[in-house]
Design a protein with these regions (language model features):
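Short helix-capping/linker segments at secondary-structure and domain boundaries
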Residues: 1-6, 45-50, 84, 88, ...
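A conserved active-site cap/scaffold subdomain adjacent to cofactor or substrate pockets
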Residues: 1-63
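Non-catalytic, well-ordered alpha-helical scaffold segments
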Residues: 13, 33-37, 70, 74, ...
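Short, hydrophobic/amphipathic alpha-helical patches that form generic packing surfaces
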Residues: 18, 38-42, 74-81, 153-158
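Small-residue-rich helix-loop
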Residues: 48-144
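Charged substrate- and nucleic-acid-binding regions of tRNA-handling and nucleotidyl-transfer enzymes
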Residues: 128-192
């Protein structure tokens, strides 16, 4: 194996500068999948958004012409360990759920959450950015005597089909109010 002291993360320029074949040890190197994923996640998080958007095409996700492509890249690169994970998350976001994660559905979808979602959908207006969506959501929750936990997870289930996603407010900005309303309506139609 080879190392440069305790350093683990290098730019290409640093790697070229520091690497010396004379410093390769005779002991066997080991492969550590967890460390590789950690390192890969670091490079994804620090990648240029436009470069990531181009790389995602190879993984079946073409958001090059999406109006919110940079916001999508920014949200998903913070969570992904691999480009495959990033692409899968974006695919889930951009496609309406055809089914819902059973565990998330049972845990978060109730009569009261469906009622709250229906009222919330009526308050959504076009062209909200994430900050405005968050402010309006908090006003809505205050007016209805509810807490964010009462709305966020059921809304996440409606939008993505599951209980894991980036910020719900960022997701609402990416999809737009009409699409969010449609997804809420689809969940309500499914019912309990």
């Amino acid at each position: 194996g080879w190392s440069h002291g305790d350093d683990e993360i290098f730019s290409m320029e640093e790697m070229k500068r520091y690497f010396d074949p004379n410093h390769i040890s005779k002991s066997c190197s080991t492969f550590n999948q967890t460390k590789l994923e950690w390192l890969n996640a670091h490079y994804i998080k620090n990648s240029d958004d436009d470069e990531l958007v181009l790389q995602l095409v190879e993984f079946g996700v073409d958001i090059r012409s999406h109006a919110k492509k940079h916001l999508i890249a920014q949200q998903y690169k913070q969570r992904a360990k691999t480009l495959v994970e990033m692409a899968e998350g974006i695919k889930i976001l951009l496609n309406r759920p055809s089914c819902y994660d059973e565990k998330a559905y049972k845990k978060f979808v109730t009569e009261s959450s469906l009622s709250l979602l229906a009222k919330f959908a009526d308050t959504l207006s076009a062209n909200l950015n994430a900050k405005e969506c968050e402010e309006r959501t908090m006003e809505f929750l205050d007016a209805n005597g509810a807490k964010l936990k009462d709305l966020a997870q059921p809304l996440r289930v409606a939008i993505t089909g599951g209980s894991v996603s980036p910020s719900i407010f960022e997701i609402c900005e990416i999809l737009g109010s009409d699409e969010v309303k449609t997804r809420i309506s689809n969940l309500i139609k499914k019912g309990l």
